[in-house]
From Swiss-Prot:
Reactions accelerated catalytically: NAD(+) + (deoxyribonucleotide)n-3'-hydroxyl + 5'-phospho-(deoxyribonucleotide)m = (deoxyribonucleotide)n+m + AMP + beta-nicotinamide D-nucleotide
Name of protein: DNA ligase
Gene: ligA
EC number: 6.5.1.2
Residues annotated for NAD(+) binding in this entry: D32, K33, E34, Y35, D36, S80, L81, R144, E178, K314
Alphabetic keyword roster: DNA damage, DNA repair, DNA replication, Ligase, Magnesium, Manganese, Metal-binding, NAD, Zinc
Residues holding Zn(2+): C407, C410, C423, C429
Function comment: DNA ligase that catalyzes the formation of phosphodiester linkages between 5'-phosphoryl and 3'-hydroxyl groups in double-stranded DNA using NAD as a coenzyme and as the energy source for the reaction. It is essential for DNA replication and repair of damaged DNA.
Length: 664
């Protein structure tokens, strides 16, 4: 038995190496026939021993059909990227980076290096996260999902022959990449497909979202990896170093990666990538520009959605011509009435487009858009269809688009404010009220569990809910009269509404629906002004002092709290028992408060993210590099060069046990 297992291990190692040479390097060292003979030998041994190694190539395609997708919590967050659509926006991003670095270097002895960027292609596929354990075995693969929780697609990813099932690595890592379908694979699949695929992106996404693993394998997907999102081993000092690590692990990587020291070089690389876009065997929709130095990334930090040290440059979208059939006017949460174009259905980038953005009447007149005319439609950022103009020859039999004078839902007279039309009937205009209630109850706002748009519509139509405050007046007996509301569901909603009364101030500010104010801005306002009363009475001059609040956002906030009706609604909410609170985090005295700490090596009781959170909760600053300003270096198993640097500089070194004793 032992001899057979050893032979199996030997065959698995050989076959995986041959697959890497064939699929990744495109340089096979043995013939297909020799490979097949070894593969067949492995299959026979697996049947005889009834043992299959988790990284065996026979695991790439299974006969099973999965029942459902399970959730997977990523060890490291998968961030989205901010986007630039032109060089002006890219230069603005670059200048913001320069400003932060100059400020940091003026106050710190440990200077940051001059900005250096790495430019890569932006692949148009599906983002995936692959987890390899301390033995180098692929144990989990997942979709991006929310960035924190994705769906387990391990079986599907194993069908991608370029993705190694085992790597030569001795610590847990998560590697981010893009699963794609090549044009060659797309054409081959469609030759025999009963339902041909429309585009490469759908081909890749559909394959990974398929519970029939054999069907996934038929799509013959590929992948490129470009980021280590979680790493329990030695930390990287630069993105270049990270990319070399990914390559050395045998993970497939695009050959194009360029280093730039200024925006002129970045622009040239973007132009080059766009020039070869049509020649590639896969789709790209832009370029990605990232800061190379890892410490600089840490100083630049993150917004609530994006890393500030990376940005995606989006290429011009595709355009096509179709007929404008009609215009539909819709009412938003703020009462703004906006036009949507109804189009003769047309295929654009593999998607059937039936509707498009028109923005407002000024936009319609400027573009000379008319009913019945042929219009140019663009999928901006390859996602949102927008009308860019008209075909002049088609205007002869077209009709003018008339601006509405009444609300399409409640028939109230509309008022014009600048380029927009508004319905001021906030009490009985269904779309306004329903969207306001849904926003107020959402998870990031008042977090009223079990609330939905369908529920909001019923509350408006059947219970005559005409304001946010009316939510807190609802009785259980009233809910029981609604469709699908039984005793338990009614009681649960009443409880959820009552529980929401005790909410943090930032969530309450966000729930109010102030124009241009998202959750991050709400948090920043609370951090600056501390109380609801202070926020209500602040000036525009004070508001622009808040990080990332410019004059437009400041005026939105100021005007919002100048509205007597809004102030009256807020007072009613407070009188009904809503108690928004703000608590400054208090940190007890401890040996690590206000200390700079560097962590190196693997800890027994903490992941890298957990120890960072723990240290920050103690009031410590966590740094990625050791300097004479470092107070402690916390050392785990297999420490890297930071340990040697600490000894060299005479920095205090502690192990995990000493750390635990100090915080008891």
């Amino acid at each position: 038995m032992d001899n057979k297992l050893e032979k199996m291990k030997e065959l698995v190692e050989e076959l995986n190496q041959y697959a890497y040479e064939y699929y990744v390097l495109d340089n096979p060292s043995i013939s297909d026939k020799e490979y097949d003979l070894k593969y067949d030998e492995l299959v026979i041994l697996e049947k005889k021993t009834e043992v299959t190694l988790p990284y065996s190539p026979t695991q790439r395609v299974g006969d099973k059909i999965l029942g459902e997708f399970s959730k997977y919590t990523h060890k490291g967050r998968l961030w989205s990227l901010d986007k630039a659509q032109n060089m002006e926006q890219l230069i603005e991003w670059h200048n913001r980076n320069l400003k932060v670095i100059e400020q940091y270097n003026s106050m710190s002895e440990d200077k940051l290096p001059e900005l250096r960027y790495i430019v890569t292609k932006k692949f148009d596929g599906l983002t995936v996260n692959c987890t390899y354990d301390e033995n180098g075995i692929l144990i989990k693969s997942a979709t991006r999902g929310t960035g924190i929780i994705g769906e387990d697609i391990t079986a599907q990813i194993k069908t991608i022959k370029t993705v190694p099932l085992k790597i030569k690595n001795s610590h847990v890592i998560e590697v981010h990449g893009e699963a794609i379908m090549t044009k060659t694979a797309f054409e081959e699949y469609n030759k025999a497909a009963q339902v041909p695929l429309k585009n490469l992106r759908n081909g890749a996404a559909g394959a990974l979202r398929n519970l029939d693993i054999k069907e996934t394998a038929r799509r013959n997907l590929s992948a490129f990896f470009y980021d280590v999102g979680y790493n329990e081993g030695p930390e990287f000092k630069s993105y270049r170093e990270m990319m070399n690590f990914i390559k050395n692990m045998g993970l497939p990587q695009d050959k194009y990666i360029k280093e730039c020291t200024n925006m002129e070089e970045v622009e040239k690389e973007i132009e080059y990538i766009e020039s070869i876009r049509g020649e590639l065997d896969y789709d790209i929709d832009g370029a990605v520009i990232v800061v190379d130095d890892i410490k600089t990334r840490e100083i630049l930090g993150y917004t609530i959605k994006f890393p500030k040290w990376a940005i995606a440059y989006k290429f011009e979208a595709k355009e096509i011509t179709t007929k404008l059939l009609d215009v539909e006017w819709n009412v938003g949460r703020s009462g703004r009435v906006t036009p949507t174009a109804l189009l003769e259905p047309v295929e654009l980038g593999g998607v059937t487009v039936k509707r498009a953005t028109l923005n407002n009447m000024d936009d319609i007149k400027r573009k000379n858009v008319k009913l019945g005319a042929k219009v140019l439609v663009r999928r901006s950022n390859d996602v949102i269809p927008e009308i860019m103009g008209v075909v002049e020859e088609s205007l002869e039999e077209s009709e003018e688009i008339q601006a509405p004078d009444r609300c399409p839902y409640c028939n109230s007279h509309l008022v014009q404010n600048g380029v927009h039309y508004y319905c001021e009937n906030t009490l009985s205009c269904k779309p306004q009220m329903v969207k306001s209630i849904v926003h107020f109850a959402s998870r990031e706002a008042m977090n009223i569990a079990g609330f939905s748009e369908k529920t909001a519509e019923q509350l408006f139509e059947k219970l005559d809910i005409k304001s946010i405050a009316d939510l807190y007046k609802i009785k259980k007996e009233e809910l029981l009269t609604l469709e699908k509301f039984k005793d338990k569901k009614s009681q649960n909603l009443i409880d959820a509404i009552q529980n929401s009364k005790n909410c943090d101030l930032a969530s309450f500010i966000y729930a109010l629906g102030i124009p241009n104010v998202g959750k991050k801005t709400a948090n920043d306002l609370v951090m600056k002004f501390k109380t609801l009363e202070s926020i209500k009475n602040t000036t525009i001059e004070q508001l622009v002092e808040v990080p990332d609040v410019g004059e437009i956002v400041a005026k939105s906030i100021y005007d919002f709290f100048e509205d007597e009706k809004i102030i009256s609604n807020i007072e009613e909410l407070l009188n009904l028992g809503v108690k928004p609170y703000y608590e400054e985090e208090r940190i007890d005295e401890n040996p690590f408060m206000d200390k700079t700490i560097v962590v190196t090596g693997s800890l027994n009781n903490y992941s890298r993210g957990e120890i960072k959170d723990k240290l920050q909760s103690l009031g410590a600053k966590v740094s990625s590099s050791v300097s004479k300003n470092t107070d402690y270096v916390l050392v785990g198993e297999k420490p890297g060069s930071k340990y040697e640097k600490a000894i060299e500089l005479g920095v205090k070194v502690i192990n995990e046990e000493e750390f635990s004793n100090k915080i008891k």
